[in-house]
From Swiss-Prot:
It is an enzyme of class 1 (oxidoreductase). The keyword DNA damage does not apply. This is Nitrogenase molybdenum-iron protein alpha chain. Keywords: ATP-binding, Iron, Iron-sulfur, Metal-binding, Molybdenum, Nitrogen fixation, Nucleotide-binding, Oxidoreductase. One of its GO terms (molecular function) is nitrogenase activity. Its EC number is 1.18.6.1.
Length: 532
């Protein structure tokens, strides 16, 4: 078995080396640092969060996409005002499938796209007056209690003072107006926008309201964007056990609830990359501990629920947890097993953002499938190697323009968990830690950061995965000539994929993709070509 693993690692490394030969020497040297063929017997490192090589077709987004599209966009009762050209404003609920329902007596502005529509004359003479007028119109039409201003590239280039416009609008209209300097060039990917949005949430929202009736089991759900209704799949499970979700950040989120997030007893973190900044700052200022979790897959959901029960250490809560786990597993086990038999032995290639690639490795394995390549669009090294690597990460030039905010503990805060218990839980359940993707990628798996179209073509054609899971930008690039594909960013209008029932939904969708009769009418290139 050892010789077989060594042979696989050697073959995959040769594939990577051959794939990079077409690039100029300097570019090839750069990309080689972003690709690792897993060898679990040795310590490995990967380069990430670096600027894209000019001329390479990347799948990344910009800082504006990270702030407006990912973090701010799903907050339903705020009007998100794009200050910039109309082309930037398309990044809305229609592209992300963030679902939301209005709170009782509340608002839901998710379906609206509001933009200042800057023109050439605004670039020349400035856009501040146009921004003020847009805010006035938003207040007149929608009567929101809060507005965000999301700046695009031209705004930063001409120097519009969106902060002063926001302050004046707050005084004039008596509402919250939150400016975000999220111009697209502020960082190497959408990850910079996540950071900017997290800072804004802490500065302007979190800690500004109080929970009227606290309960012993109040929690936050961080890094959940309710794609296709994912949050709504797991929320009833939490409530059945006895938890109350104070705030979801930010899927189906309300700015009032986000303002109360500091009073939760525990924050669970789904997408590590997009919002771990807020978790860290909340723990520093308000003492709210966080727990990295994965509720995609039966095993992941079980593990999460048991860790949460361990954190609260309440006998009745623990009993209810086991009861709900047994009940939910029994509902879907038989149907899941039918699909597992059909999918066993199939291979998958995953390329996504946030923590999704990691989570779906676990889910594919649960279905008997093997992940042969995986990677992230906008990860940092700790998303691959774990948070223990953070002290060793050197700050890059573009990273220096992002404000890394730290807080002192609020003297009025009384910790709900003692420091001794926190240390104990760090060992028991991995509280406030994340081990990264590497530990769950087996020997020979190609782990690749910032996958580009050339690499997609070579890897998919050579590895011949049974399915390619990524986003809309590269879905058809892989699907047309080679492999069936599924989006795991917006689920191809399907889902939900979280919790116990999500496993069944996902297995059904993968089975349809792999065994659709339409594939009988297509001859893959590697079957048509004379391969020696």
């Amino acid at each position: 078995m050892g010789a077989e693993i060594d042979s696989r690692i050697e073959d995959e490394q040769k594939l990577v080396d051959d794939m990079l030969k077409v690039l100029p020497e300097k570019a090839a040297r750069n990309r080689r640092k972003h690709i690792v063929v897993r060898n679990c017997s040795t310590e490995q490192h990967i380069e990430a969060d670096d600027k894209v090589i000019p001329g390479i077709l990347t799948n990344r987004g910009c800082a504006f996409a990270g702030t407006k599209g990912v973090v701010f966009g799903p907050i339903k009762d705020m009007v998100h005002l794009v200050h910039g050209p109309i082309g930037c404003a398309f990044y809305t609920w229609g592209t992300r499938r963030n679902f939301a329902k209005a709170e009782e007596g509340g608002d839901n502005f998710m379906n609206y796209c509001v933009c200042t529509d800057m023109k050439e004359t605004d670039i020349v003479f400035g856009g501040e007056k146009k921004l003020k007028k847009a805010i006035d119109e938003v207040v007149k039409i929608f009567h929101p209690e809060a507005i965000t201003i999301c700046a695009t590239c031209p705004v930063g280039l001409i120097g519009d003072d969106i902060e002063s416009v926001a302050r004046e609008a707050e005084k004039e209209h008596g509402i919250k107006v939150i400016p975000a300097r999220c111009e697209g060039y502020r960082g190497v990917s959408q990850s910079a926008g996540h950071h900017i949005a997290s800072n804004a949430l802490m500065e302007h929202l979190i800690g500004t309201e109080e929970i009227k009736s606290p309960t012993p089991f109040d929690i936050n759900v961080f890094g959940e964007y309710n794609i296709g209704g994912d949050l709504w799949e797991v929320k009833p499970i939490f409530e059945k056990i006895g938890y109350r979700i104070v705030s979801s950040l930010t899927g189906d989120g309300s700015f009032h609830r986000i303002s109360q997030a500091h009073q939760a007893k525990l924050s669970i973190l789904v997408c590590h990359r997009s919002i771990n900044y807020t978790n860290r700052m909340m723990e520093e200022k308000y003492g709210v501990p966080w727990l990295k979790v994965n509720y995609i897959g039966t095993k992941g959901t079980e593990k999460l629920l048991r860790k949460m029960a361990e954190f609260f250490d309440d006998p009745e809560l623990t009993r209810k947890t086991e009861e709900v786990i047994a009940e939910e597993k029994a509902k879907y086990a038989e149907d899941i097993e039918k699909y597992r038999k059909k999918l066993k032995g199939k291979t998958a290639f995953i390329y996504a953002g946030g923590s999704r690639s990691h989570h779906y490795i676990n889910l594919f394995e649960e279905l008997g499938m093997k992940v042969i390549a995986a990677g992230y669009q906008f990860a940092h090294r700790d998303d691959y190697e774990g948070r223990q690597i953070i002290p060793q990460i050197k700050e890059k030039a573009l990273g220096s323009i992002l404000e890394d905010v730290h807080y002192e503990r609020d003297e009025n805060v009384k910790p709900t968990v003692s420091p001794e218990r926190i240390e104990e839980l760090k060992t028991k359940i991995g509280l406030m830690d994340y081990k990264g993707l590497f530990p769950d990628a087996e020997d020979g798996t190609i782990v690749i950061d910032d996958l580009n179209h050339h690499e997609t073509e070579v890897l998919v054609k050579t590895l011949k995965p049974d399915i390619f899971c990524s986003g809309i930008k590269d879905k058809y690039w892989a699907q047309k000539p080679w492999s069936p594909s599924r989006q795991i960013h917006s689920y191809d209008y399907s889902g939900r994929y979280t919790g116990f029932s999500g496993v069944l939904n996902f297995a059904r969708d993968i089975d349809m993709a792999l065994h659709s009769p339409t594939w009988k009418f297509i001859r893959p290139p590697w079957k048509a070509e004379n391969v020696e």
